[in-house]
Amino acid sequence: MGIKRLSKLIKTYCSEGVQNRELKYYSGYKIAIDASMCIYQFLVAVRAEGQSLSWGDSTTSHISGIFYRSIRWIENGIIPVFVFDGIPPEEKIHEFEKRTKRRQDINAKLQDAIEQQDQVLVSKYDRMNVKMEKSHIEECQKTLRLLNIPYVIAPSEAEAYCAWLCKSKFVDAVATEDMDSLCFGSPLLLRNFNTALSQKLPVEEYNLHKILEGLQFTMEQFVDLCILLGCDYSATIRGVGMKRAFEYIKKYKSIDNLIGIVDFPDDFKYKEARTIFFTLGTDTSNNFTNENPINTNIATWDLIAVDSASINIEAVIDFLCNEKGFDKGRIETGIKKLQKQKKVNKQTRIDSFFKKKL
């Protein structure tokens, strides 16, 4: 879910905190990618176009998306670092339950539309019914591993780990559609990053420092604002929307000061949500050595690179072509494009000289 209406709030009350850029602006950047969000977009995009990208009984749109989109980013001088979700906080269970209920409702509507032979509604609910499976994630990780493109499985929430990587200056920005990466302290958040090439959209860049400065909020007040707006770790408050949430924090400074003023539901666990936002994006939660080759293919955060020179082409062909049915010629062409981009691993932005040491 992310943070409800946060993007609109920032554009309304602090327009200087967001700006549009072309993708080429980020040449030379190392960017942490919210992998789950990325895969989900690939799965939905194929449904939206009315295609059926599959091999046998297996969907392959997620693999195709990861393969070709990564190549395009790297061709543009960008090093993607894919971050996958780990174990979610217990407080997120209620959000998963709501998603399950929504999916059941959507599936029922889909079946009704099929019975009525309403192709417009069938297409609509089919897209809404997309579910990312464990196999989708594992196949994308294998693809990245074979291509030597950096990836890591986070200890917990991917958005929190992305924020930590950015705060620690191991990457330069975070690419996700979920605005809660700002709550975890990500200095720079990029939206539309995954679709900027395919849909020719500008990348929306959110600068946390400018947002806090423009709103005249502390980080603590900003997090409380986001909890009031609605997040994954607490219930929402009936009657509190974007404008009222902003006015409450502007006037009362803290959710604690709203006790007795606002009628909080029993499951409004704002203190627990605060704790998650202020702990999951810290060194304490994320400072671990990259010892398990299953969890990551990155040896050290100070040397993040796309090692295209040592790609095992036979292994890539065996998985993508023999096992998943991709066209061998196209895959070989893609690999050649990757191997032409060796310089992207050597380009360094000036602030990388100040990267944090573990």
UniProtKB/Swiss-Prot annotation:
Phosphorylated. Phosphorylation upon DNA damage induces relocalization to the nuclear plasma. One of its GO terms (cellular component) is mitochondrion. Pfam families: XPG_I, XPG_N. GO terms for biological process: base-excision repair; DNA replication, removal of RNA primer. The keyword DNA damage applies. DNA binds at residues 47, 69, 157, 230, 232. Gene3D superfamilies: 5' to 3' exonuclease, C-terminal subdomain, 5'-nuclease. Its EC number is 3.1.-.-. Its cofactor is Mg(2+). Belongs to the XPG/RAD2 endonuclease family. FEN1 subfamily. Interacts with PCNA. Three molecules of FEN1 bind to one PCNA trimer with each molecule binding to one PCNA monomer. PCNA stimulates the nuclease activity without altering cleavage specificity. This is Flap endonuclease 1. It comes from Enterocytozoon bieneusi (strain H348) (Microsporidian parasite). The gene is FEN1.
